[in-house]
Amino acid sequence: CYDWFEMNTLNMAQQGVFGEVIRAQGAYIHNLSPFWNHYWKNGENDKLGWRLDYNMRHRGDVYATHGLGPVAQALDIHRGDRMKTLVAMDTKSAIGKALVEERADSTCNNFRNGDHTTTLIRTENGKVIEIQHNVMTPQPYNRLYQLTGTKGFANKYPISGYALDAKQLTASGVQPKIDDLNSHSFLPKSEMETLVAKYQHPILKKYGEMAKEVGGHGGMDFIMDCRLVYC
């Protein structure tokens, strides 16, 4: 919720830049292979560590907050809309099962968490949310974060960008400098910077530079605390 892109995009969504947001994506996709050995272990006989053990015992999206939080804000969940229907599907556990067998030196017959889980949620007002979870396969870190609106589009990974329809470009204060600027591609860098400057989130205006100095996930942890102070 507290990444610069997500916060500025939230402000744009709340100001109507994207029109009505009808679909959103979020995820926690983070290959944890370098980290499994560093999670807390319950004594020297614990071969797995708490996180791998938790994934082994629980099915579904076991860490939905990273993906769901930002898009729930953008869709006004519990601020005029609510989640109504959910369906989820996961792959089999191939890597997770192998990790347990490698560490425990025994056969793993029931690793419950699939290597990749996809969840679809439909809201009361007819919006759709897609959330993904994957901590197993070798791929770049990705929270997806994508908003699809009736007048515009925002995307964080793998390339950050915004696209707006022709009328919304002018309405949002963007003055195109090239003739073919349209919703078929992301805004050029200069126009994107203009848009972000206009709709910079108030919390970032007040605490952004301080957050960069303090750090903590690039300043996001600090911004999260600042939101409590700001409220």
Predicted regions and their residues:
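Residues that flank catalytic or metal-binding motifs in active/ligand-binding sites
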Residues: R82, D115-T117, R143, T150
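C-terminal helical cap and adjacent loop that interface with cofactors, partners, or active-site loops
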Residues: A72, P140-P158, A163-C231
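Predominantly a Rossmann-like dinucleotide-binding segment in NAD(P)-dependent oxidoreductases
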Residues: Y2-F111, L228
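Short glycine/serine/proline-enriched coil/turn segments at secondary-structure junctions
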Residues: L32-P34, T137-P140
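Short, mixed charged/polar active-site loops
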Residues: V128-E130, F153
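Active-site beta-strand termini and strand-to-loop segments that position acidic
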Residues: T119-N125, G149
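A short catalytic or substrate-binding loop motif that flags glycine-/basic-rich loops and adjacent residues
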Residues: T65-H66, N110-D115, T123-E124, P138-Q139
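Active-site rim elements
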Residues: Y54-D61, S106-C108, H133-N134, G208-G218
